[in-house]
């Protein structure tokens, strides 16, 4: 594994040093997320879509590369944990691991993840297998969090919102950087990127390498003597490249490829000698942008997403000391997701915009471990929206759209949304969005055929939701701060779960079950500049998420609070970022018992940066995550006693106090 680390390190170094050096300073004034209206994006129709949605009444948060670097975040999960209001995201056992997610009271499976507009969600399974455990933070230009029902433009699973991870962008001037560092969990990190003109176009290339021995994932007294894998280690590597050619001011072609691979331990408290997944992932895209006139622009994009993993688990045999039970030996599971997206924007008259689009997705996957048969599914979708601009209605923007989804397996889904934004003047505004969204059944729910467990159902209906998001905001008098009060409401029906039991085969069978998931909540946030040298943000979110009047749904926090401050004196060669993350009551019911609250904790992080030279090409970053070494659980699971076989509660631990240091050379 060390040889892989050094090979990726060499690749990163080549990317960063191989281009001619020139001055390029790293932005430092950014400590967290910001509203998308404040972000200037120079691109074509797809890249500008979040900005257009924000003007129509959709709430969009943005996390920038500067905020990620200043916070010393290692992966995508860490980058979002402390920065985005209303977003709960908890890795199982530290960086590059599975995560539980809740956006404004949602379930994990209600959030759609994309990279450069390509869907990442693992449609083998609905929840718990988020597609984030091999994605490093260093490759990010920005992360866009689009809240509310986003099925109109983004399709399945965007019930509570969509998160688009934008990788390093193009530049007209050659620049880049190389970073190396480590932390007190015996971790090593190296990343680099270079970008600029090349031949007739522009290029971007980036690479990242992370390796760690990790930390103890459970309390020591919750391990069984039979388990000898006591630290959860990982190694994760990424290589990516983009190339763009502008054939004319009206025609642009962009191609990209990213390869992620790694070895990720899977922590288990009993029996395990070693358990891990070997990940491999490729995301290949090609996109053509055409600006035909001032009243018509469009894009066509093809993508191929290949995700494969091999799971290995060797267990100790308590009945034969020194003996090994082979549970899984490089057993494959994975999927291929490929398709075409096309969208056009028309301006038929002043003050009116029309969007028309088509999506095609072909998906197939299989799992040898949990026995999901290999099947293929295709989905065709048509969508359209009409919106106004303030040129037509002063200070008011309205939008309405509809989407029709036709999968080859399962039943069709039609959804629609309406939204509005009114600017009162003086920076005060009112936003509202209402609509519905859907989640298509997963491969497990459609095609599973495990003779000892479960069976899928090809006749499932999609889960469907009704949503309402409303917010009111404005400036704080006398300072450069802005506040926003948000209400969110969501009902989800046609729930997919085990519905019947087949006594002949002994299998649970999936079906659409009665009941409704109801989410009701509110959020208040404030952000901006306290002084020219101090910026910050703070937020509080309350979520009630229940099913049919029952208790709070497991793994969805009742309350969240986040705060951050960034000190960036422009005349001094340093900066400091501090953040607070509070998770309120959050429940789980492991080991066959009743609900257990494993929340109510606060984690503090602090980081500092020192610029060595006047041009700010060289910087040293130090950080302290979990400053007070708070011992907290990110999830609860079930273990089994070696002697009796009885189940017991296991606490998955969050990252302990960790000191990090990095050096960056920019050019």
Mark where each language-model region is:
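A beta-strand signature from Gram-negative outer-membrane beta-barrel systems
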Residues: 134-177
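Short acidic/polar hinge/loop motifs at secondary-structure boundaries
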Residues: 100-102, 119-147
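Periplasmic-side early beta-strands and strand-to-turn transitions of outer-membrane beta-barrels
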Residues: 164, 171-173, 181, 193-279
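N-terminal periplasmic "start-of-domain" segments of outer-membrane beta-barrel proteins
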Residues: 38-71, 100
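Extracytoplasmic beta-strand/coil segments of soluble accessory domains associated
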Residues: 52, 77-119, 141
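Conserved C-terminal beta-signal and adjacent last beta-strands/turns
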Residues: 195-198, 206, 245-246, 432-433, ...
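Gram-negative outer-membrane beta-barrel transporters
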Residues: 354-355, 391-398, 489-491, 511-590, ...
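Outer-membrane beta-barrel signature, preferentially recognizing the C-terminal barrel domain
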Residues: 272-291, 333-335, 429, 436-492, ...
């Amino acid at each position: 594994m060390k040889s892989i680390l050094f090979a990726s390190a060499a690749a990163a170094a080549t990317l960063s040093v191989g281009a001619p050096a020139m001055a390029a300073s790293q932005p430092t004034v950014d400590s967290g997320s910001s509203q998308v209206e404040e972000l200037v994006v120079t691109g074509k129709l797809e890249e500008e879509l979040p900005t257009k949605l924000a003007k129509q009444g959709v709430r969009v948060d943005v996390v920038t590369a500067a905020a990620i670097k200043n916070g010393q975040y290692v992966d995508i999960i860490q980058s979002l944990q402390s920065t985005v209001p209303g977003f709960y995201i908890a890795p199982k056992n530290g960086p590059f691991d599975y995560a539980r997610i809740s956006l404004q009271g949602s379930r994990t499976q209600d959030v759609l993840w994309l990279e450069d507009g390509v869907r990442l969600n693992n449609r083998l399974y609905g929840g718990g297998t988020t597609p984030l455990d091999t994605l490093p933070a260093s490759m990010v230009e920005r992360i866009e969090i689009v809240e509310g029902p986003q099925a109109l433009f983004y399709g399945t699973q965007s019930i509570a919102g969509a998160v688009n991870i934008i990788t390093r962008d193009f530049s007209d001037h050659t620049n880049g950087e190389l970073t190396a560092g480590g932390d007190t969990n015996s971790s090593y990190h190296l990343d680099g990127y270079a970008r600029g003109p090349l031949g007739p176009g522009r290029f971007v290339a980036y690479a990242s390498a992370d390796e760690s021995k990790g930390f103890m994932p459970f309390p020591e007294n919750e391990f069984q003597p039979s388990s000898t894998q006591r630290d959860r280690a990982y190694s994760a590597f990424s290589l990516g490249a983009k190339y763009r050619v502008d054939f004319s001011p009206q025609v642009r072609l962009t191609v990209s490829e990213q390869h992620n691979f790694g070895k990720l331990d899977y922590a288990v408290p009993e029996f395990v000698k070693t358990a891990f997944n070997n990940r491999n992932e490729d995301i290949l895209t090609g996109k053509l942008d055409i600006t035909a006139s001032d009243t018509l622009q469009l894009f066509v994009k093809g993508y191929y997403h290949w995700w494969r993993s091999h799971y290995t688990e060797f267990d100790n045999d308590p009945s034969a000391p020194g003996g090994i039970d082979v549970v899984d030996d490089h057993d494959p599971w994975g999927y291929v997701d490929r398709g075409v997206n096309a969208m056009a924007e028309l301006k038929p008259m002043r003050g009116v915009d029309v969007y028309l689009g088509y999506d095609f997705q072909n998906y197939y996957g299989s799992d040898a471990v949990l026995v999901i048969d290999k099947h293929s599914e295709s989905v065709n979708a048509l969508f359209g929206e009409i919106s106004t601009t303030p040129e037509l209605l002063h200070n008011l923007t309205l939008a309405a759209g509809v989407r029709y989804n036709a999968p080859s397996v399962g039943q069709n889904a039609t959804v629609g949304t309406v939204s509005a934004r009114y600017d009162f003047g003086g920076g005060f505004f009112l936003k509202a969005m209402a609509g519905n969204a859907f989640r298509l059944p997963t491969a497990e729910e459609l095609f599973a055929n495990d003779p000892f467990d479960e069976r899928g159902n090809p006749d499932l209906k999609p889960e469907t939701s009704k949503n309402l998001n409303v917010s009111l905001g404005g400036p704080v008098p006398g300072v450069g701060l802005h506040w926003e009060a948000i209400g969110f409401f969501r009902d989800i029906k046609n729930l997919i779960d085990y519905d019947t039991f087949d006594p002949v085969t002994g299998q649970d069978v999936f079906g659409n079950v009665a009941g409704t998931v109801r989410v009701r909540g509110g959020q208040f946030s404030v952000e901006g500049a306290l002084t020219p040298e101090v910026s910050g943000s703070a937020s509080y979110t309350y979520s009630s998420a229940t099913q049919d009047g029952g208790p709070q749904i497991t793994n969805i926090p009742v309350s969240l609070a986040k705060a951050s401050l960034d000190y960036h004196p422009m005349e001094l060669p340093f900066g400091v970022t501090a953040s607070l993350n509070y998770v309120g009551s959050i429940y789980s019911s492991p080991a066959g018992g009743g609900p257990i609250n494993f929340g109510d904790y606060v984690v503090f992080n602090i980081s500092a940066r020192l610029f060595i030279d006047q041009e700010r090409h060289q910087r040293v970053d130090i950080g302290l995550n979990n400053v007070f070494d708070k011992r907290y659980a990110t999830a609860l699971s079930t273990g089994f006693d070696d002697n009796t076989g009885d189940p017991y509660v296991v606490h998955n631990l969050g990252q302990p106090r960790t000191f990090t240091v990095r050096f960056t050379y920019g050019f």
